[in-house]
Amino acid sequence: MDAVGAAGGGAMLPAAARRGQPPQPPCMTTAPEQQAAAGGAVIWPAAAAAEAKEKMVVDARTMQLFPTRSADGVVVSPAPAPAAAQERRRPEVHVTPSVPATAPTAPLTIVYGGQVLVFEHYTAEAAEKLVQRTQHLLAAAAGGGGGNKNNNVTVVTPPPDEPPMLLPPPQMPAASGVSAGGVMPIARKASLQRFLQKRKQK
């Protein structure tokens, strides 16, 4: 390196800095013949590069996507990940052999016990399996109970070209004292009648 400055405490300024280029770290060799032999690239001494790699602590859990810089200013490129680690990162795809990947799906609507259940993207094969399983469970329950009940389960699947119907939310009984049958309690009814009679008289 070529330096300009006084020996008695003056600032050392590299020649590259005088030309507007960034200064190079002192551990680099910058002989012009070595740079020309390397195609103009900066040549690092092998000892300095090995020392810099030892100083770098790389966490195995992080992905080293970009070159990193050690405390000495030495740039160390990331090491390629082992093949086993790369295979671990790939998501596993499980394909069920009985259901092709392009099976048409439709919403499945089940009405049971006053509740409406809607399942999106249900295949016809899965719906058939569900119906068979439900019939099996109902037959087992009817056989064990000894009752002569007629348990029918209806599974409705709309055609795929129709938009799904949205059901209104269930109506909650009003908190005004009206019961589910629409009959007011007798005491409130009598009180309301007295109020209306007095209002008519005024």
UniProtKB/Swiss-Prot annotation:
The lineage of its organism: Eukaryota, Viridiplantae, Streptophyta, Embryophyta, Tracheophyta. One of its GO terms (biological process) is regulation of jasmonic acid mediated signaling pathway. Residues 1-11 have a biased composition (Gly residues). InterPro entries: CCT_CS, TIFY/JAZ, Tify_dom. It holds the Pfam family tify. A motif (Nuclear localization signal) lies at residues 187-194. Residues 12-21 have a biased composition (Low complexity). Residues 1-31 are annotated as: Disordered. This is Protein TIFY 11g.
